Swiss-Prot record:
Protein keywords: Acetylation, Heme, Iron, Metal-binding, Oxygen transport, Phosphoprotein, Transport
Protein name as it appears in the record: Hemoglobin subunit zeta
Keyword Secreted: no
Any one GO CC term of the record: hemoglobin complex
């Protein structure tokens, strides 16, 4: 699966709107993940998982920074995500299904925060983009 030129443009345009709110978007995405899929909390036993905690905000920002880096490397995603894939596969040993769960929570957060901008075309492009990211992040599991 690859992104078409118009999908890349949609993703980059939406990212420009999101980048300034990276920390709150990332935090809200994690809070949605932990609320909707409580089993994902097991990967964060050392975190304060209360609403708006410093650790949630920091990790949310880290996730969104990685998403932003992926947007910047949209034409070479595999190379851009190699270290992140290795970290999650070999060191953190995150169940690959969690990438899809996080992706879904990010899409819901985007829709809630940008209702006028989150058109069906934006939804489709970002869903495809996050599916590609999830797939790349699970490559090292094979």
């Amino acid at each position: 699966m690859s992104l078409m030129k118009n999908e890349r443009a949609i993703i980059m345009s939406m990212w420009e709107k999101m980048a300034a709110q990276a920390e709150p978007i990332g935090t809200e995405t994690l809070e949605r993940l932990f609320c909707s899929y409580p089993q994902t909390k097991t990967y964060f036993p050392h975190f304060d998982l209360h609403h708006g905690s410093q650790q949630l905000r920091a990790h949310g920002f880290k996730i969104m920074t990685a998403v932003g880096d992926a947007v910047k490397s949209i034409d070479n995603l595999s190379s851009a995500l190699t270290k992140l894939s290795e970290l999650h596969a070999y060191i953190l040993r995150v169940d690959p299904v969690n990438f899809k769960l996080l992706s879904h929570c990010l899409l819901v957060t985007m829709a809630a925060r940008f209702p006028a901008d989150f058109t069906p075309e934006v939804h489709e492009a970002w869903d495809k983009f996050m599916s590609i990211l999830s797939s790349i992040l699970t490559e090292k599991y094979r």
